[in-house]
Amino acid sequence: MEQCWRWYGPDDPVTLDHVRQAGATGVVSALHHIYDGRAWPEADVLERKRIIEAAGLTWSVVESIPVHNSFKIGAPERERYAGYYRDSIRTLATAGIKTICYNFMPVVDWTRTDLMYRLPTTGYALRFDAVDFAAYDLFVLQRKDGAASYTPARIAEAEKRLKALTSEQVDQIERNLIAGLPATERKYDRDSFREALAEYDGIGPKELRDNLAWFLREIIPVAEEEGVRMCIHPDDPPFSLYGLPRVVSTAQDARFILNAVDSPANGLTFCTGSYGTRADNDIVAMVKEFADRIHFVHLRNITIEEDGSFYEAEHLEGGTDMAHVILALMQEEARRRKEGRADWRIPMRPDHGHLLADDIGKKKINPGYSLIGRLKGLAELRGIMRAVEKFGLA
């Protein structure tokens, strides 16, 4: 597998020298300053590529080209933005960058309530507290019809939790939820967030799924012409938040997506951490089922708690059998090599990492994307890859 590393560009506190020191050879990056649906200018793409290659690395994966909200709500202007998206695909392909990750999550991207969850190891992880989330949704945001999303027991728990939280703790939860985590396209205050949610009135899973299928029909033919592999990232977490539909959460969802436009250009970013947050997702079985359409991999592990909360575990701990995931992926690589595919190598990155050692206390850290935690995770994952190779298992 191609060992990659997410890099947020020149302002990332983790430098490209650090990336090389971690042992990665590929970079996962994007033009994060262009988030409003405009086509990516060729000059900007080439400059980012130049910077990466000057450091002795390869820009292997784009993560992500943002998917404009008009696609998700089915607004008339989506026709115009589809043209911009196709232009960006062509520009990247011309520059030799042919793996493009994207997501179709409405309003909010990846979501956590706690960015500094202290672990027994004394490091820190990212956590989603289901009760804190409900308390915010019901009693701080006061979302219209919010109670319909929860059981009476959860509503009672949430009300009790809110009373136990200080105003500072509530403010911190709100910042974590709506002010924007790394790579999120939009940042909100409470009023603008309510307005964004209102755009989805009347849009349920069927409507969002239909809009995703429309998007795929518009962009996949161009990706196929250009030799580009599009790969959709799952919902994180893979269940409804704020009453919004989410349609990239299960194996059934993945089947719908791949069948909507049956093309090698239409594939998956297989994020073990996102899919793994649902106990009913059999991660190893999903990897095996969708292997030939997995174009990019995020390797991360999750520990799910009884009340539906979860936190990000060590890469080799948690609920996902990471060794068998990697084995299945490397066996797929071997199959592709035998088939003669030029794109046989699957790019992967260690997804998130604990906040550890000298990174603790640094003022400028992208949550989940500190250096040392990801370096540790990549080293552990690399160990499994080497063992698979050494023992001739793939």
Swiss-Prot record:
GO terms for MF: ferrous iron binding; manganese ion binding; mannonate dehydratase activity
Keywords from the named record: Iron, Lyase, Manganese
Cofactor(s) needed for function: Fe(2+); Mn(2+)
Superkingdom to which the source organism belongs: Bacteria
Pathway assigned to this chain's UniProt record: Carbohydrate metabolism; pentose and glucuronate interconversion
One Pfam family named in its UniProt record: UxuA
Substrates-to-products reaction catalysed: D-mannonate = 2-dehydro-3-deoxy-D-gluconate + H2O
Name of the molecule in the record: Mannonate dehydratase
UniProt organism field: Mesorhizobium japonicum (strain LMG 29417 / CECT 9101 / MAFF 303099)
Gene from which this protein is expressed: uxuA
